[in-house]
Regions:
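Catalytic alpha/beta active-site cores
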Residues: 1-124, 142-145, 149-158
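Short alpha-helical functional segments enriched in proximate histidine and acidic residues
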Residues: 138
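Extended amphipathic alpha-helical segments enriched in small hydrophobics
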Residues: 124-132
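Thiamine diphosphate
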Residues: 3-6, 162-173
């Protein structure tokens, strides 16, 4: 998808440093939850960290990855497992980028997450609060991040499709 955005921007004379958007190029969730992967994990992670590097240099407003817990939850995990697997995937991507020589203080501020929300209102709120604290702790304690923006757990939430019911005409009586 990023290549398409780049091609269109070049065709229309738009500088890459003006582009903004988000990729959900989270290959590890495909292995865990969906089974729709094409390439093995190692080359897939290399491609992802290559995108981190390319965006770091050429597209500074681009959110380099949206790491998905949504699909993991829809595949049957608990909310605790959703966070655990999502952050395990995130740690893998961050470690790979650091091993490539990238600075987590810089690229870390453009990582985002995609979480699921089920019907347990208070439990879900607690999960989101815990996610913010856990991610900040992971970035600070494990990777030595000091940039406050790179410590933020930025995320999008969507209603879990598995919590929706089929049409039931008596629900609104």
């Amino acid at each position: 998808m990023l290549a398409f955005y780049i091609a269109v921007s070049e065709k229309h004379g738009v500088s890459l440093n003006k582009l903004s958007g988000t990729l959900q190029n989270d290959i590890l969730k495909e292995y865990i939850a969906r089974g729709t992967y094409i390439y093995p994990p190692k080359p897939s992670i290399k491609l992802i960290t290559d995108i981190f590097e390319f965006c770091d240099i050429h597209i500074p407003k681009w959110n380099i990855i949206s790491i998905s817990g949504y699909h993991i939850r829809e595949a049957g995990s608990t909310l605790e497992q959703e966070l655990a697997f999502t952050f395990a995937n995130a740690i893998t991507y961050v470690e790979s980028a650091i091993n490539k020589g990238l600075d987590p203080n810089k690229f870390g501020q453009r990582i985002s997450f995609f979480f699921n929300s089920h019907n347990g209102f208070l439990e879900e709120i607690s999960k989101f609060r815990a996610a913010r604290k856990l991610w900040a702790s992971i970035m600070k304690d494990r990777f030595g991040v000091t940039n406050k923006r790179a410590l933020m757990c930025r995320f999008h939430v969507q209603t879990g499709g598995s919590t929706l019911t089929a049409s039931q005409i008596d629900n609104n009586i």
